[in-house]
From Swiss-Prot:
Residues 67-117 form the bHLH domain. The gene is BHLH109. Coiled coil: none annotated. This is Transcription factor bHLH109. Homodimer. It comes from Arabidopsis thaliana (Mouse-ear cress). It comes from the Eukaryota.
Length: 185
């Protein structure tokens, strides 16, 4: 008896799934009956059509969401690759390469190198843009090269102001800064 009860339950489930299968073979617009529907004697049911539309809309949304996720992942991968390539180019410009493979240590070394370059530029610009505190007497009385009988600076006159100076002044702007890899006392 239990066996018959099980068969009856499964028979109803089979009929339900059979009707679902038949509707899945139905034409696109569902206005005419499929030959399989005619054979099994199934009639058109509006409830089934409404049921079919919802999964299609859901599956469309799911497919659209999946495509957008794939696109975002692809763009993120492309962005990461571009960043890695540009960091490698920057690292190639440095005189001593960092052998560490991680991005953070590479960027840290690049930043330290750029800071040291900026410090060197500051020191050099301060040395040539400010007037020296001490000027040797012979330099103040020097003639221009075109006025000299030799056609160039005389041997006693330096080419650059700080060349022959015994005292090089300490500039407060430069003296207060230290290279990035050194600490102040």
């Amino acid at each position: 008896m239990e066996r018959n009860n099980r068969n009856e339950g499964t028979h109803e489930e089979e009929q339900c799934s059979l009707s679902d299968i038949i509707y899945s073979f139905c034409s696109e617009n569902h206005s005419e009956l499929n030959p399989l529907q005619e054979i099994f004697g199934v009639t058109k049911n509006n409830d089934h059509e409404k049921h079919d539309e919802e999964p299609d809309e859901e599956s469309y949304r799911m497919a659209k969401r999946q495509r957008s996720m794939e696109y975002r992942m692809m763009m993120e991968k492309k962005r990461r690759k571009e960043i890695k390539d540009k960091v490698d180019i920057l690292q190639g410009l440095m005189p001593n390469h960092c052998t560490k493979p991680d991005l953070a240590s590479k960027l840290e070394n690049i930043i330290e190198y750029i800071k040291s370059l900026k410090y060197q530029v500051d020191v050099m610009s301060m040395a040539y843009t400010t007037t020296p505190v001490y000027t040797p007497p012979f330099y103040a009385a020097a003639q221009a090269p075109c006025m000299s009988p030799w056609g160039y600076y005389t041997p006693g006159v330096p080419m650059m102001p700080q060349q022959n100076m015994t005292y090089i002044p300490q500039y407060p702007q430069v003296y207060g800064t230290v290279p990035p890899n050194q600490t102040q006392p």
